[in-house]
């Protein structure tokens, strides 16, 4: 009788340990869907070129190149990819001439695409820039800090998985850590797990040189996709 009781408690403990935490539910639910649906947002575009390197390289064009590489790799693996933009243009009407209103309309449009997509996760692609210190470098992933607790936890898990894949795959010695970040429009109150990937620093000569290379862009894309798939366990 005593042995049966011990076995019962061992079995109960095993069941409790395998129950997913609240933050994992969103990502685990995605495993049952076929195919995985992913929104890729290439940051900036149009009149908004984003950060600019000393040599004139604009963030928006690099964002789009990496976003398209993720799209291509994802589709090869059976992932359904929704792009917020596929051209150099921004997502705003021609009638809005003031920069502030163009930017606001652009961001609202991106958020609406994500919210109405029915996607499992969303990743927005950006480049960092820190002109006061050109030594700062490396890719870094950010996750939201405000919103639904389960989505926030799932976003944090996703950010960690992508960051790990970038550190391992790029192997550039930067080893940055994923971080929560507020006051980013697309990261505020997300409707699905969402992260922002800063792929490197345009202000760092070494990062910039690599980011302009198609092979490095492809490598970043593969790492990001690997991190997504590892987290969702496709």
Regions found by a protein language model. Give the residues of each.
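Active-site-proximal helix/loop segments of hydrolytic enzymes
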Residues: 4-9, 17-33, 64-234
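Short glycine-rich His-centered loop
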Residues: 36-56
């Amino acid at each position: 009788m005593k042995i049966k009781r011990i076995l019962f408690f061992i079995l109960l403990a095993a069941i409790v340990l395998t129950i997913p935490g609240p933050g994992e539910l969103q990502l685990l639910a995605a495993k049952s869907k076929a195919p995985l649906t992913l929104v890729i947002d290439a940051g900036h575009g149009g009149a908004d070129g984003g950060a600019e390197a000393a040599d004139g390289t604009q963030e928006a064009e690099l964002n789009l190149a990496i976003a398209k590489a993720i799209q291509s790799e994802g589709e090869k693996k059976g992932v359904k990819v929704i792009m917020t933009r596929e051209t150099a243009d921004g997502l705003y009407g021609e009638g809005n001439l003031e920069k502030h209103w163009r930017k606001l309309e652009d961001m609202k449009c991106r958020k609406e695409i994500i919210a109405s997509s029915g996607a499992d996760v969303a990743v927005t692609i950006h480049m960092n820039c820190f002109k006061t210190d050109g030594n700062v470098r490396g890719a870094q992933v950010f996750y939201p800090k405000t919103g639904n607790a389960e989505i926030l936890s799932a976003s944090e898990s996703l950010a960690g998985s992508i960051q790990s894949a970038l550190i391992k795959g790029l192997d550039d010695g930067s080893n940055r850590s994923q971080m929560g970040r507020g006051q980013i429009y697309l990261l505020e109150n997300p409707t699905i797990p969402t992260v922002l990937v800063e792929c490197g620093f345009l202000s760092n000569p070494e990062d910039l040189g690599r980011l302009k290379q198609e092979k490095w862009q492809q490598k970043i894309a593969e790492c990001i996709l690997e991190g997504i798939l590892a987290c969702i366990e496709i």
